[in-house]
Each structure stands twice: as C-alpha cells, then as structure tokens.
Amino acid sequence: MARIAGVNIPDNKHAVISLTYIFGIGRTTAKKILDTVGIAPTTKISQLDDAQLDAIRAEVGNYMTEGDLRREVSMNIKRLVDLGCYRGIRHRRNLPVRGQNTKNNARTRKGPIRSIKR
C-alpha cells in the first residue's frame, strides 16, 4: 500500500479511484492530478514506480487535503456560529442549513423522534 498525504492508498485499484481515498480529492481533482503528472487514470497504483509516486505526492501537496481541510471546514462553521447569523443558528440547533423544509422530513439532521411526555 502506497502512502500519500498520510493516507494508505489501495494498490489493486485504478489510480484515479485510489486518489479519491484522500479527503478533499474527488474524481475530477484526481484526474487533474494524474494529467499533470502524466499518468493514465486506468493505471493501477501497484504498477507505478517510486518516482511516479513521488510526483503524485508533490502534486497532491499543492491541494488542501485531510487535516488542513477538515480544520478549515470546522473553523468556517465555528465562525458562522460565533457570528450568530442564520446559518450559524441552524448549525447550533442541528437543523438543515440550506433551506430545506423541516415540517415533515429532515430526520437525518434532527435525529430520532422524541416522544412527547404527558
């Protein structure tokens, strides 16, 4: 297993799929990285030599991934909560943030139904 950006990448999968195991890299970004490095997306990670893996590591280093990206996302949410804006209040109350209806659905975000005690 190759290790890129602190993540173990599976050897038996295509390079474009293996790179998506890194938080912050999806299919499109993985294809861009492989095009920049000059590796075919259908190449398996086990077929790459160390120089090619180092080139991929260097290119992935140009993107914000894993811990840095997670930290930035959580800081953005914390900033909204501290501001007390509408989106921050929705985050604080664990309700949908992007305008979805909550009268009938939104069970994933709201959690299990709490019964009313009489």
UniProtKB/Swiss-Prot annotation:
Where is the segment annotated Disordered?
94-118
**Can the keyword Ribonucleoprotein be found in this entry's annotation?**
yes
One annotated GO biological process: translation
Q: Which GO terms describe its cellular component?
A: cytosol; small ribosomal subunit
Comp. bias intervals (Basic residues): 106-118
Q: Does the keyword GTP-binding apply?
A: no
Single GO MF annotation = tRNA binding
Q: Which keywords does this Swiss-Prot/TrEMBL entry list?
A: Ribonucleoprotein, Ribosomal protein, RNA-binding, rRNA-binding, tRNA-binding
This protein's superkingdom? Bacteria
Q: What does this protein do?
A: Located at the top of the head of the 30S subunit, it contacts several helices of the 16S rRNA. In the 70S ribosome it contacts the 23S rRNA (bridge B1a) and protein L5 of the 50S subunit (bridge B1b), connecting the 2 subunits; these bridges are implicated in subunit movement. Contacts the tRNAs in the A and P-sites.
The family classification in the record reads:
Belongs to the universal ribosomal protein uS13 family.
How does this protein assemble?
A: Part of the 30S ribosomal subunit. Forms a loose heterodimer with protein S19. Forms two bridges to the 50S subunit in the 70S ribosome.
State the protein's name.
Answer: Small ribosomal subunit protein uS13
